[in-house]
Regions:
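Residue-level signal for inorganic ion chemistry
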Residues: 11, 31, 67, 89, ...
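Hydrophobic face of amphipathic alpha-helices that form TPR/SEL1-like repeat modules
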Residues: 1-29
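Glycine-rich loop-to-alpha-helix module at the N-terminal edge of alpha/beta enzyme cores
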Residues: 32-121, 132
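Rossmann-like NAD(P) dinucleotide-binding subdomain of oxidoreductase/dehydrogenase enzymes
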Residues: 123-268, 303, 321, 394, ...
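Structural signal for hydrophobic packing residues in well-ordered secondary-structure cores
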Residues: 56, 60, 75-82, 86, ...
Length: 492
């Protein structure tokens, strides 16, 4: 019997009677159908907005320390259920257990950051800003917020959004990816268990119709999105046109730049983790490797080929020791294999073909290395979102930086070097938002904002960190005078 995943509207978990379309949820490691999710629409979004609006009236005036206390309880429940959550992520997403634990851990870090809301949302004051005038700024919640999240991080990305939004005094509607709804449901159940009042956090499942309804609904004031650049731009444009605050994180083509003086062993570990972790399905995956100089490139082609030949690609729901799991579904598998099959026609060389490492069932593509990729080809321009590392051979650091800066994306880039001068030039000249020096995945922790540039981000204020607090609050400035003997002076 199939498990149908319910919506959360107010305090009620329910599958809407009016919904007639459902899509299957697969275990990517086996292809097994493990449930189905309803494709909801405007009616369900309206119900969620109504519940969130009612809850906002009381939650927005709940003292910040009380909101923080609920988040502290939530954080404790997340820790108690850590292993269960990680295995749920592995089951519906396919990443290895260790990667799933990292997914959950990074989400919990955002909850921990949000627990400090009593400090984070403090305003500013300046007594006697003018004669007998005191000035105070306050940060206040903005209203009903919405989040639209992808399949690649079922725990972390939703928790980039709703804990901080709710900590700031807002209410929230989450539309998780229809491919991975199980983790989101469990996260919401634990928040209820922590004592969160009904209607503060709601979940509506669905596809394009729900996305557009959230972006256009007059009762929603802000929309957060993570996904492809094509849909990020759509969400940003549609939401902005309807008067909403929007932060929309899109795709990426992150570069791993290896200098001749890079330390071999730590650099190898960093490249493998960056390019092939989570089967390459993350917006901070290293997907372009630039070995500066032919000798450097030749050495790294050999090192990587030897390491990849020992990779264990397996069913992550059954083998906790697998190095890599599947991609999310059959469509993703077909698309990634298409990039590999088309490589020779663009003049590139398949240096290591991971397709032969793939298990017979499930949606697998083994770790693959493609050398001599040229600018202007699809391997350079497009986000593959799979375990394929494209290798390029710039002659100098200057040439590498120039090549990187032609790209339309601007999420992350890393340099591996022992030279402080090279690292400094790299950090000064690269045009993207998150940089690593001898770090393979330069994704910031919750204390800092996730700062994509160019077509990797649409909006002004990023997720996480203080920018996240600013996104989910608005500023009020109060000028007050309480003097006994007021004499009008200079317009005051």
């Amino acid at each position: 019997m199939k498990t149908t995943i319910p919506n959360l509207i107010g305090a009620r978990w329910e599958t809407p009677a009016s919904v007639t379309q459902f899509v299957p949820i697969h275990n990517p490691s086996t292809g097994e159908v493990i449930g189905e999710v309803p494709l909801c629409g405007q009616v369900e979004v309206d119900a969620a907005v109504n519940a969130a609006t009612r809850a906002f009236a009381t939650w927005s005036v709940t003292p910040a320390p009380k909101r923080a206390a609920c988040l502290f309880r939530y954080r404790e429940l997340l820790e108690q259920n850590f292993e269960q959550l990680a295995r749920l992520v592995t089951r519906e997403n396919g990443k290895t257990l260790e990667e799933a634990k990292g997914d959950v851990r990074r989400g919990i870090e955002v909850v921990e950051f949000a627990c400090g809301i009593s400090h984070l949302a403090k305003g500013e004051s300046l007594p006697q800003v003018a004669d007998q005038i005191d000035a105070v700024t306050m940060r206040e919640p903005i209203g009903v917020c919405a989040g639209i999240t992808p399949y690649n991080f079922p725990a972390m990305v939703p928790m980039w959004m709703y804990p901080l939004a709710i900590a700031c005094g807002n209410t929230f509607i989450l539309k998780p990816s229809e491919k991975v709804p199980l983790t989101a449901v469990r996260l919401a159940e634990l928040f209820q268990e922590a004592g969160l009042p009904e209607g503060v956090f709601n979940i509506v499942h669905g596809g394009r119709e729900v996305v557009d309804a959230l972006c256009t609904h007059p009762g929603i004031v802000a929309v957060s999105f993570v996904g492809s650049s094509r849909i990020a731009e759509h969400v940003y444009t549609l939401g902005s046109r309807h008067g909403k605050r929007v932060q929309a994180a899109g795709g990426a083509k992150n570069v791993l730049l290896v200098m001749p003086d890079a330390e071999p062993d730590p650099t190898l570990r960093a490249i493998l983790g960056s390019a092939y972790g989570c089967a390459g399905q993350r917006c901070m995956a290293g997907s372009l490797l630039m070995g500066v100089g032919d000798q450097t490139a030749d050495e790294w082609r050999e090192r990587l080929g030897a390491a990849l030949s020992e990779f264990k690609v397996d069913d992550t729901s059954a083998n906790d020791r697998a190095d890599m799991g599947p991609v999310i579904d059959g469509a993703a598998q077909k698309r990634v294999i298409g990039f590999v099959e088309g490589a020779p026609a663009s003049g590139a060389e398949i240096a290591f073909d991971g397709r032969r490492l793939s298990p017979d069932r499930g949606f697998f593509v083994g770790p693959t290395l493609i050398d001599r990729v040229q600018p202007g080809t699809n391997l350079f321009e497009e986000e593959i979102f799979g375990p394929v590392l494209s290798m390029m051979r710039p002659k100098t650091l200057d040439e590498a930086i120039a090549m990187m800066n032609t790209h339309s994306y601007g999420n992350g880039a890393s340099i591996f070097t022992s030279s402080g001068a090279a690292a400094r030039q790299f950090t000064r000249e690269i045009q993207c938002g998150m940089l690593g020096i001898n770090v393979g995945v330069p994704a910031p922790m919750a204390l800092f904002s996730f700062s994509g540039w160019n077509r990797s981000f649409f909006g002004d204020l990023h997720v996480q960190g203080l920018e996240g607090v600013m996104f989910y609050t608005r500023q009020k400035v109060v000028l007050s005078r309480w003097d006994k003997n007021y004499v009008r002076s200079q317009g005051w």
